[in-house]
Amino acid sequence: MKSHAVVFTAPHQVSFHEIESPAPGPEDLVIELHHSWISNGTEGSFLRGERLSGDVAWRPGDPAPFPMVAGYQKVGRVLAVGSAAPGFAAGDWVFASMSRVCGMFDNQFAGHVSPSV
């Protein structure tokens, strides 16, 4: 699925890219983002080039962690609901803290992606 994402491409450089999001599974929601934000703490430290991954500080000689899909916080409307995701309906407003696109947290997930799975 084609999505758009906020990408940190280098220290202090941000761009907007088209990316490939994974196909939604039965436990997933597809969300059209309306608001997303970059935190001054965690995400700011990645953008400034101070972190390598998760809570690991960058040190001279480490590979740069760029490019990376940033984020872990977003608000949007549900576009589609997986068969094993009870309690949600298309059109619901939701807050989500992650999506299934690899990003700032190694094998965890990123957030500034729309539509987001």
Provide a role label for each language-model segment.
Residues 10-12, 25:
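Residue-level recognition of beta-strand termini and adjacent short loop/turns
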Residues 16-18, 75-77, 93, 107, ...:
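Conserved hydrophobic/aromatic beta-strand scaffold that supports enzyme active sites
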Residues 99-115:
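A structural motif shared across PLP-dependent enzymes of the aminotransferase-like
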Residues 7-9, 48:
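Residue-level signal for short segments within beta-strands and strand-turn junctions
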Residues 22-38, 46-101:
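Glycine-rich beta-strand-centered segment in the early N-terminal region that forms part
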Residues 2-4:
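Extreme N-terminal starter segment of soluble prokaryotic enzymes
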